[in-house]
Amino acid sequence: MFFDFVNEPIQKAERVKMVDSRKDRIYLKAYSELIVYLRHLFSCYNDSIPTDKLEEFLSGTKWGWVSFFKSLTASKEYDKITFVTYNYDIWLERILSCLKIPFSIKGFEAETTPCVEIIKPHGSISFVPKNYTTTYSVSYSLDFEGVSIDQLELKYNDLTHYGKGAIIPPAGDSMRLNVTAPWSQHLRNAAKIAALDISENDEVVLCGISYWHVDRRELDELLLNLNQDSGFTFINPSPPRDLNAVLISIFKNYVQQSSSSEIGGILNGKTV
């Protein structure tokens, strides 16, 4: 696939030849179209729920994560909370904004106080090129030199107008895309550093992860760099057998929970 060889320097001549090949160009065009489709799909989902509807949901829900977020505003237990998310959407950012919880996006904004930091190694619909004209179109130009993170900026409005952005599509490995997507490698390194900073007194929560083979390499990198003595909670009603086995073998203080309703009580080391 495109992902497997695009970063190999010795393949550059072959890549250029393939761009000029009518036979193979269809696959590269499909790759370009997939990026635009994913951006547009998640942007449309985002626009389907206006802020007032989201605030209404947050005010009446018993969702465990909301309980956790609300606890953050009153608790002084944690001086820093880091979210490493592989989601393209901006629901987390919007929820934190609605709850008036300051946060920063790693690579784009300075840390807030108290510090809630979000790291998105696979990109986001909010990552767009600087000075980009908001016209919807599919660009078939293949930029083999890549886009660095300082060439991107955050945007939260009119996201359906952007045909280009920064996301790693499914089956993409940010390590192998360090040439064509250096912004992703920067954020992947930031996530690794965050993992290394975890101490035995810290809490780690894992959820929403399938442990599919294409993401396994990245997830293993984070898991193996975490402190084995930290408190580790995995939330999944049907945990993948392979992932569960890995977590049991790594972490001494491992707890598996079936519902996010439990997350609301993780502060102070308690469950609800």
PLM feature segments, named:
Residues M1-S43, L58-T61, F68-R176, P182:
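Extended, H/D-rich, highly charged conserved domains that either
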Residues S21, L54-E55, D202:
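Alpha-helical interaction segments
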Residues I35, S48-P50:
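Charged, alpha-helical interface segments at or near domain boundaries
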Residues L54-K62, V179-H186, I209-Y211:
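Short, flexible loop segments at the rims of nucleotide/cofactor-binding pockets, characterized by
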Residues G64-Y78, I193-L196, E221-L226:
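Catalytic-core regions built around general acid/base machinery
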Residues Q185-V272:
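SIR2/sirtuin-family catalytic core signature
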